[in-house]
Structures are given as C-alpha cells and as structure tokens.
Amino acid sequence: YNIPLGWGRRDMPGCLGVLGNRDLYDDVSRICSDCQNVFRDKNVESKCRSDCFSTSYFETCIMALDLAEKISDYKLHASILKE
C-alpha cells in the first residue's frame, strides 16, 4: 500500500475504504477538524472521527457547521470509507 507520510492508524479509525478514497476522507475529516475549532474541546475531533465517522458526534458536527443540506452526502462518504 502506498500510504502518504504522516498517516497513521489514528487517522483512519475503522475506515477500511480510505485507501483509494483520500478525497472523501479529507472531506469528512475536515468536518471534524472544523467542529473542534467551533467547540474548542480537544475531544470533539476524535469523537467525531470515531468508528469511521459513524457516531452521532459526526452528525452533530455537520449540523453545528450549518451544513445540514449536505448531511446525506457526508454520511454517504463516511459509509464508503467504512466498507
């Protein structure tokens, strides 16, 4: 596998489909990073990413970032990554 430098297991929590889908991963991962900046809580990002973005934290972050109109797209991306 050709995994970019700087990537580790913590970057892909349960996301078996991340290889070959880096653009999707970057897209959903950015939601969690932005969410942590909004809430200023060091645990938000890891909770958002947990179980490959399939927890309620991920959905809460989408809503907190005022991206409700794209929630189905982000959930689809997360499900692709989890495969």
UniProtKB/Swiss-Prot annotation:
<dbReference type="GO" id="GO:0005576">
    <property type="term" value="C:extracellular region"/>
</dbReference>
<keyword id="KW-0964">Secreted</keyword>
<dbReference type="InterPro" id="IPR031098">
    <property type="entry name" value="Crust_neurohorm"/>
</dbReference>
<keyword id="KW-1015">Disulfide bond</keyword>
<dbReference type="Pfam" id="PF01147">
    <property type="entry name" value="Crust_neurohorm"/>
</dbReference>
<comment type="similarity">
    <text>Belongs to the arthropod CHH/MIH/GIH/VIH hormone family.</text>
</comment>
<keyword id="KW-0372">Hormone</keyword>
<dbReference type="InterPro" id="IPR001166">
    <property type="entry name" value="Hyperglycemic"/>
</dbReference>
<feature type="disulfide bond">
    <location>
        <begin position="35"/>
        <end position="61"/>
    </location>
</feature>
<feature type="disulfide bond">
    <location>
        <begin position="15"/>
        <end position="52"/>
    </location>
</feature>
<dbReference type="InterPro" id="IPR035957">
    <property type="entry name" value="Crust_neurohorm_sf"/>
</dbReference>
<feature type="disulfide bond">
    <location>
        <begin position="32"/>
        <end position="48"/>
    </location>
</feature>
<dbReference type="GO" id="GO:0005184">
    <property type="term" value="F:neuropeptide hormone activity"/>
</dbReference>
<comment type="function">
    <text>Inhibits secondary vitellogenesis in females. Has no hyperglycemic or molt-inhibiting activity.</text>
</comment>
<keyword id="KW-0527">Neuropeptide</keyword>
<dbReference type="GO" id="GO:0007623">
    <property type="term" value="P:circadian rhythm"/>
</dbReference>
<protein>
    <recommendedName>
        <fullName>Vitellogenesis-inhibiting hormone</fullName>
    </recommendedName>
</protein>
<dbReference type="InterPro" id="IPR018251">
    <property type="entry name" value="Crust_neurhormone_CS"/>
</dbReference>
<dbReference type="GO" id="GO:0007218">
    <property type="term" value="P:neuropeptide signaling pathway"/>
</dbReference>
